[in-house]
Amino acid sequence: MWICPICKTTNETNICRSCGFDLSKDYAMHRFLCQLSASGRKIFKPVQPGDNILMASSNTDYVFGRKMDRTKITTIYFRNKKENIGEDAWDVSEKQNGSIMAWTEENRDGFKDLYLAANGNILANKDCSKLFSGYEKLKKIVGLQYFRTDQTENMSFMFDYCKSLASLDVSHFDTSQVTDMLGMLGMFNNCERLASLDVSHFDTSQVTDMSYMFHECNGLKILDISNFDTSNVKNLSVPLSEYLAVPQEYV
């Protein structure tokens, strides 16, 4: 038995069942494990708010560093509090400091729900390429407002082949730093069930590649790209209007 130094919860396993602190982890913020004190508490430097940076996850054979079939996940939950952490939780922070924990739970449909939790907002990695690519059975993303993208430089194929995703709120996405050469290449490629998508606020002034950005988004009825700045786009492949299979409204 030990007492978590963060939330003071009594635990039996190495991972705190409330906040996800890992007793056996060599935390990057401290670099060594301290000896247990007489009170049973472990001392380490607390994670700072700016450390909630999510790891990159561009290998579609993995889910944030863990070998897993992405097509088995139907819902992704972003949480701004680390509580009720699952027993199979693993560290998905870029710095491996325990600031962001992930776990899965079986749902009623026989598939899995994926949870991502941190104390505060989750900061997107600079490289978000293929972050959600290949989640073909993914129906919804809950709590995406807790996911900040203001430091992200590459969003290529970010939601590629999310073929079952019926709605997606990216209205809060900050794309001002998207400067990578691939930029927004195939960002929403094959999101065929999306009926609407609000990208009207996207800052595309530094993006050089928008190829296949909305390719095969056959379900889209309304798409507002009137504010898109394509002055630096070197590769558009085909005009944006031709990505869409049905008549669209451009507000």
How does the language model describe each region?
Residues 3, 15:
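The −1 position to Zn-ligating cysteines in a subset of zinc-ribbon hairpins
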Residues 38-251:
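Negatively charged
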Residues 16-19, 28-31, 140, 167, ...:
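Short linear functional motifs in flexible/disordered or boundary regions
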Residues 8, 20:
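Cys/His-coordinated zinc-binding microdomains
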Residues 21-39:
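Short microdomains enriched in Cys/His and/or Lys/Arg
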Residues 11-12, 23:
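Cys/His-rich microdomains that often coordinate metals
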